[in-house]
């Protein structure tokens, strides 16, 4: 039975013939392939110092808790004072409205900033907006504890904080909101933060120290001396009088 099946299969295979209708199809396919142009692969430029993958986890902090070593002691420091006439951080950049501190520079803790942010989100719940933070906590505060004698080191880590200069923007907001609603949200947030704050809009004049650059006032005008100088005639007469005076005997 097996021999008969193999012989029948062999005879069927030998009876196969190539059809003549395949010749024009093959010619047409060859002509089409000759017309088509091969698509060259697009070269991908990869920098030599960039890894295509990473086996390490991403270590990134937030605006309230940075990815810094807590065991490394930090100096207390002082907030930035723009003595050279800088207006950096005093105007609204990304949003339409902002919250600006106007009384005195100070250090604000991360807990206070988080409370102010939660207050704004609670007031604007259900609205379409975007909140921008213009400050970030990057200063570690170390406390040695109550009733501790002087010395024995700086102390252990307590919390994160940020140094805020006078007239610096802390929060900005942009969205489909009424101005009065945003004013109310910033008013509630200002009550949660230390100091006095004001509501500013995009396009308001910048501030140098505690002086607003408005009504044609410029930084060059602030650099001029406030004390009025003596007239040239008065200075020349004073010099001539001192030169002609007789020396004391």
Swiss-Prot record:
Residues spanning the membrane: none
Localization (cell): Mitochondrion
Family: Belongs to the universal ribosomal protein uL16 family.
Keyword Ribosomal protein: yes
Native source organism of the sequence: Neurospora crassa (strain ATCC 24698 / 74-OR23-1A / CBS 708.71 / DSM 1257 / FGSC 987)
Gene: mrpl16
Gene Ontology biological process terms, A to Z: mitochondrial translation
InterPro entries for this protein: Ribosomal_uL16, Ribosomal_uL16_bact-type, Ribosomal_uL16_CS, Ribosomal_uL16_dom, Ribosomal_uL16_sf
MF annotations from Gene Ontology: rRNA binding; structural constituent of ribosome
Key words of the record: Mitochondrion, Ribonucleoprotein, Ribosomal protein
Protein name: Large ribosomal subunit protein uL16m
Subunit structure: Component of the mitochondrial large ribosomal subunit (mt-LSU). Mature N.crassa 74S mitochondrial ribosomes consist of a small (37S) and a large (54S) subunit. The 37S small subunit contains a 16S ribosomal RNA (16S mt-rRNA) and 32 different proteins. The 54S large subunit contains a 23S rRNA (23S mt-rRNA) and 42 different proteins.
GO CC terms, sorted: mitochondrial large ribosomal subunit
Described function: Component of the mitochondrial ribosome (mitoribosome), a dedicated translation machinery responsible for the synthesis of mitochondrial genome-encoded proteins, including at least some of the essential transmembrane subunits of the mitochondrial respiratory chain. The mitoribosomes are attached to the mitochondrial inner membrane and translation products are cotranslationally integrated into the membrane.
CDD domains per record: Ribosomal_L16_L10e
């Amino acid at each position: 039975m097996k021999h008969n099946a193999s012989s029948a299969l062999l005879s069927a295979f030998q009876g196969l013939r190539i059809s003549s209708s395949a010749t024009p199809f093959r010619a047409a396919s060859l002509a089409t392939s000759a017309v088509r142009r091969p698509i060259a692969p697009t070269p991908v430029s990869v920098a030599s110092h960039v890894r295509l993958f990473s086996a390490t986890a991403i270590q990134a902090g937030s605006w309230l808790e940075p990815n810094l070593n807590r065991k490394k002691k930090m100096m207390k420091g002082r907030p930035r004072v723009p003595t050279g006439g800088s207006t950096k951080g005093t105007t609204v950049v990304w949003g339409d409205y902002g919250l600006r501190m106007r009384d005195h520079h100070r250090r604000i803790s991360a807990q206070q900033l988080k409370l102010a942010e939660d207050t704004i989100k609670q007031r604007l719940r259900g609205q379409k907006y975007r909140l921008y933070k213009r400050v970030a906590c990057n200063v570690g505060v170390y406390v040695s504890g109550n009733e501790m004698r002087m010395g024995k080191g700086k102390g252990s880590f307590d919390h994160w904080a940020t140094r805020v200069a006078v007239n610096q923007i802390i929060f900005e907001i942009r969205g489909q909101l009424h101005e009065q609603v945003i004013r109310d949200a910033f008013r509630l947030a200002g009550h949660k933060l230390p100091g006095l704050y004001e509501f500013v809009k995009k396009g308001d004049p910048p501030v140098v120290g505690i002086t607003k650059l408005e009504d044609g006032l410029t930084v060059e005008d602030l650099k001029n001396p406030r004390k009025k100088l003596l007239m040239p005639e008065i200075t020349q007469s004073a010099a001539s009088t001192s030169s002609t005076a007789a020396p004391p005997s």
